[in-house]
Amino acid sequence: MDVRFYPPPAQPAAAPAAPCLGPSPCLDPYYCNKFDGENMYMSMTEPSQDYVPASQSYPGPSLESEDFNIPPITPPSLPDHSLVHLNEVESGYHSLCHPMNHNGLLPFHPQTMDLPEITVSNMLGQDGALLSNSISVMQEIGNAEGAQYSSHPQMAAMRPRGQPTDIRQQASMMQPGQLTTINQSQLSAQLGLNMGGTNVAHNSPSPPGSKSATPSPSSSVHEDECEDASKINGGEKRPASDMGKKPKTPKKKKKKDPNEPQKPVSAYALFFRDTQAAIKGQNPNATFGEVSKIVASMWDGLGEEQKQVYKKKTEAAKKEYLKQLAAYRASLVSKSYTDPVDVKTSQPPQLVNSKPSVFHGPSQAHSALYLSSHYHQQPGMTPQLTAMHPSLPRNIAPKPNNQMPVTVSIANMAVSPPPPLQISPPLHQHLSMQQHQSLAMQQPLGSQLPMQVQTALHSPTMQQGFTLQPDYQTIINPTSTAAQVVTQAMEYVRSGCRNPPPQPVDWSTDYCSSGGMQRDKALYLT
């Protein structure tokens, strides 16, 4: 980038003399760059842009009409070599109107231009080298090595760039748009704090990005809280894990079968049995341990011939035991084969006896189809019983709407079930007798709800071409109350015919059980 410097023109007499800040040479303001108000920091001008003298007008607020009350920052208590750094810290930039330094920014004269207030947040948003260098300069004021680092830019770049905690807190508390002016008292207070607290940072051999080995109080407190919480959680989890473990059930010893042969004992055990009674008789107060010691000494004192007698007894007992064991195992195997056969043969009678239904085979499908179609046509009846629960017998039907509880007693039923779709004449005659009895018992009950004893409800036409018409035969019990169980018997009887219907050869048993095909109107045969 080409930077052109123009010779200083004649300064008008009306221009006020710019006071010098610090011992730095006070050069002419025309060599300084213009300040860009939008960017809030100094920037290099374009190569094609000419420098405008102070006598010419340029857009922006008038400088001559405004008064700038910038107090001179020259603390007398500080040494001379630190004044240069104070100017840099106050303005956020390095020495005024010098040639380009290592920061890459042209210095400027603060009193000849519209200089907005410098904010810490804007300093944080600028180049990292500018911020780190300015803060490191503040840290070096109380140290004797500060002059050496500031005189050499390469050493200043190698200098640690740790930020003090008070500067970080101040930068985090500032809002981006808040403007703060650094005066002498604030600067001296910050410098005093830095002089007392930041000397250790220069002697630490750790690199710039390394963390200190000693944790801060806040972090140590947080770690302690985390440890306590982990201990509490661990203490809570341990009982849960203990509770989750099932208590070990002691292994139950297998009960020995009394039929199982017992193992033979050794020769010494046989000798022990023989001599134990004699020793107990001589020493009744002797314990089992003392008796066993005496028996062991006697066994050692026996000769080989006496020992062989006991050994022969044990060998004979072993042979007998093996024979008995083989026979016992063979009996167990034979029982394991015969038990499942007995179970299988005993199951079919139970299945047959568990279904005491009147009709069998296709007639059950007829009853289910008839109930579903009938109650679909008449919504007054309760449709909950149309599913025909398996536990209910097939001869039970739901009660009509809001009638008195009735009980059905069907006597003299045939024990053996009739063939499908066939009703024996004695049964039909018995049902007709029950119908007449129910009509006779209904006459005195005129004040109660009317009850229809015989309901002609027709089912859809079957495959044979005739219609099944059921008769509801009910016998009213005068002593029945509302708490009694309500049952009704539904029997299928062909209207006008006592003979059983012929069963064709092409009858399909799956026809009626394929689903409840429902009709809107009942079909009648004329």
Curated annotation (Swiss-Prot):
Any single Pfam family the record assigns to this protein: HMG_box
Major localisation: nucleus
Polar residues biased stretches: 194-203
InterPro entries in alphabetical order: HMG_box_dom, HMG_box_dom_sf, TOX_HMG-box_domain
Ranges of compositional bias, category Basic residues: 246-256
This protein's record includes keyword tRNA processing: no
GO CC annotation, single: nucleus
SMART domains according to UniProt: HMG
Quaternary assembly: Interacts with HBO1 complex composed at least of KAT7/HBO1, ING4, MEAF6, and JADE2; this complex is involved in histone acetylation. Interacts with DNMT1, LEO1, PAF1, SAP130 and SIN3A; these interactors regulate chromatin remodeling. Interacts with an array of proteins involved in RNA processing and translation and DNA replication.
Protein task: Transcriptional regulator with a major role in neural stem cell commitment and corticogenesis as well as in lymphoid cell development and lymphoid tissue organogenesis. Binds to GC-rich DNA sequences in the proximity of transcription start sites and may alter chromatin structure, modifying access of transcription factors to DNA. During cortical development, controls the neural stem cell pool by inhibiting the switch from proliferative to differentiating progenitors. Beyond progenitor cells, promotes neurite outgrowth in newborn neurons migrating to reach the cortical plate.
Protein name, entry field: Thymocyte selection-associated high mobility group box protein TOX
Organism: Mus musculus
